[in-house]
């Protein structure tokens, strides 16, 4: 005969799938939650702004203008045979996607603390939805690039067909770095102050306003340890065509670092995921 006192103390614990296969099946089962979180974040971002989605166009456009004046007009840096605004904006697209993803991912778990602490679902859905929201901004900003191409009568070469490959690499870099920051920010809230600094510093050391070809040859391989360098160079190679060249050793190094970042990001996130509800 069961003891009522013992029965009253029993708890029901719902855990994530113990096997990797079950975990990814859980993500598919909860796909509607993923759609909801992504759509909610898109709506909230622009709902109470005066000009709405136009903010996704204004910020990269103004940054492009500043970089064009400083590096193209004043510093007279080479443009790889393309109009300087197109050179800059072909790098602004992946950089903005990457930097926005870091900012959104790092705070995504904290911002959904009530949901995470009360309901079981694969936590990977939360930062992934944040990256998808940043990708929507990326697609919107792409209209500026199309406008610049039309303005300068710039016609891309067949290389443009390889652009989806580099978009995939940018997505992997954003996810990998975002998962690390999202996981660390749950336990160490200092990262809410560190991430904006990392994003600002990353803009200065990445070839957004200039071509990476201006970096001295002896430093280019070391410079390519920055994973976003290979992504930006790939975007420019695909979009600009013509004189633009892809520094293959540096690109492969950046690609390897992106793969490492992506795989290790998923591994670490899965490792600490079960503690999120306790410490958040």
Enumerate the predicted regions with their spans:
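Hydrophobic transmembrane alpha-helices and immediately adjacent juxtamembrane helices
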Residues: 1-280
């Amino acid at each position: 005969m069961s003891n009522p006192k013992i029965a009253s103390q029993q708890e029901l614990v719902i855990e994530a799938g113990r096997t990797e296969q079950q975990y990814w099946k859980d993500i598919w089962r909860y796909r509607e939650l993923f759609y909801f979180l992504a759509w909610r974040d898109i709506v909230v971002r622009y709902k109470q702004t005066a000009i709405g989605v136009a903010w996704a166009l204004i910020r990269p456009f103004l940054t492009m203008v500043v970089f064009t004046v400083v590096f193209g007009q004043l510093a007279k840096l080479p443009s790889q045979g393309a109009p300087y605004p197109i050179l800059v904006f072909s790098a602004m697209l992946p950089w903005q996607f990457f930097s926005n993803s870091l900012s959104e991912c790092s705070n995504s778990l904290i911002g959904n603390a009530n949901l995470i602490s009360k309901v079981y679902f694969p936590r990977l859905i939360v930062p992934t939805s944040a990256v998808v929201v940043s990708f929507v901004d990326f697609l919107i900003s792409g209209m500026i690039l199309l406008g610049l191409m039309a303005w300068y009568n710039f016609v891309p070469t067949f290389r443009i067909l390889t652009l989806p490959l580099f978009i995939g690499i940018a997505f992997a870099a954003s996810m990998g770095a975002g998962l690390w920051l999202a996981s660390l920010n749950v336990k160490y809230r200092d990262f809410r102050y560190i991430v904006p600094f990392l994003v600002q510093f990353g803009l200065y050391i990445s070839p957004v306003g200039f071509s990476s070809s201006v970096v001295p040859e002896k430093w280019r391989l070391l410079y390519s340890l920055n994973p976003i360098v290979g992504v930006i160079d790939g975007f420019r190679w695909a979009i600009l065509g013509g004189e633009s060249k892809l520094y293959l050793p540096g690109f492969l190094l950046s690609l390897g670092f992106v793969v490492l970042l992506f795989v290790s990001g998923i591994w670490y996130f899965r490792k600490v995921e079960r503690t999120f509800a306790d410490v958040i």
